[in-house]
Amino acid sequence: MKMTSKKMKDELMKKLSRPEWDFHYDSEKEVLRIEQKDSKKGINVSLPGVVAKWEVNKEKAIEEVAYYVQEALIAMHKEENSAAKILPVIRSTSFPKQAEEGNPFIMTDHTAETRIYYALDSNKTYRLIDERLLKKLGLTEQQVREMALFNARSLGYEFKQDTVAGNTFYFLNTNDGYDATRILNESLLQSMREKISGDMVVAVPHQDVLIIADIVNEIGYDIIAQMTMKFFAEGHVPITSLSFVYEDGDFEPIFILAKNRKKTDGKEKG
């Protein structure tokens, strides 16, 4: 059998077939590229050189090249994961619960409107952690949650401030993909609670904004409702159009409070 670059390409693709790797063949340059689907990092193999080795060593030449490529790609993946951070992200409760059939994401309940997912972030790539990835990382769900919350506390914050009709609104919008995640930083929420004189209202209309408001009158509630709806409609990754009253570590959706107010008002009038 005469070995050609095209035949060698087919042989290597058979040896290196893995669901997390992609192949790209440049027939003009006779180069086969094998790369990781997530990071796009990979190895280029010049096929004429492998064919020349095959003429001398036959199958052993293919085995050696396949081994080299496999080890290099696995090393790249380990290096990438060791540099990666696990961070929590806030999503709507309507967000998919599975990456695909039979492969659920790692999740934690948060509020009636929001759920916590976990992202493996290496700056260049960002992937929500599902059960299969969890196994590859060699971590438990509890370890992922603890690491994520620890890293969330290290995220910086600097608010812009605006006052309307006596109500003060604080906006966080760094566009780092984790603005809404700051809602999980309990020490941040407590420090804001101390400086707020009225009701503390918190909103995460989309991934790239956190709003904390000091609401002292009904106008303030109207403003935060309109503001949250506007941000929700404009967000690249919308979360919820509802805002929450924050008290003693709990988030109460405002529409529930409004319903309770109406019931109370009705009883008083009766």
Swiss-Prot record:
It comes from the Bacteria. Transmembrane segments: none annotated. InterPro entries: DUF1444 (IPR010838). Belongs to the UPF0354 family. NCBIfam families: PRK13668.1. This is UPF0354 protein BCAH820_4810. The lineage of its organism: Bacteria, Bacillati, Bacillota, Bacilli, Bacillales.
